[in-house]
Amino acid sequence: CGVGNFFGMLPESMSESKLYGVELDSITGRIARQLYPNARIEVNGFEKTQYPDGVFDLAIGNVPFGNYRVSDRPYDRHNLLIHDYFFAKTIDKVRVGGIIAFITSNGISGGTMDKKDTHAREYMARRCDLLGAVRLPNTTFRANAGTDIAMDIVFLQKREVPRMQGEPLPEWVETDLLRTNTYTDKDGRERHDHVT
């Protein structure tokens, strides 16, 4: 959850919501606890959390990314990279009809939505419907985080009934069918100086 930026941007209509957060870094997590004392923030790895399945209405986050895996027994058999693991576990934690809105990497960093290996997208497509995705220019987080990395915002809704093995999957599972917006190229570089 970082220092709780998503909590701070919560619309007034959701001000009575119960807030939960998970932050690996102890200093950052303690700052979030101070800023949002009514939120239940765990300072721990997501793989060590014990939230029950099907309890959250909405999950929002900026998932970690990288070419590594964490060990979490129920998910180890899927052999998912860290960012894809966050999707998989979160899908289980939201209720049927619940929404997931995650910022995740794309492009040469082995992103969730465009890497050649479709395993993670197949996992998501069996359990969720894709509501939409936005590809951000690689300069989106330059001023705030000092990084130039291409990112996607992915919106999923958990299905009432998962798609069965052998049932056709939606076209977004295949990378060659992924459509990007006109403001970024396939590597996430900006095509225009501004958007109006």
Please report, for each region that a protein language model flagged, where it lies by residue.
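Conserved S-adenosyl-L-methionine
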Residues: C1-G61, G66-Y68, S105-N106, V154
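Extended, compositionally biased low-complexity polar/Lys-Gly-rich tracts
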Residues: G2-G4, G8, D92, M124, ...
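Flexible, glycine-/basic-rich loop-and-beta segments that form/coincide
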Residues: A143-T196
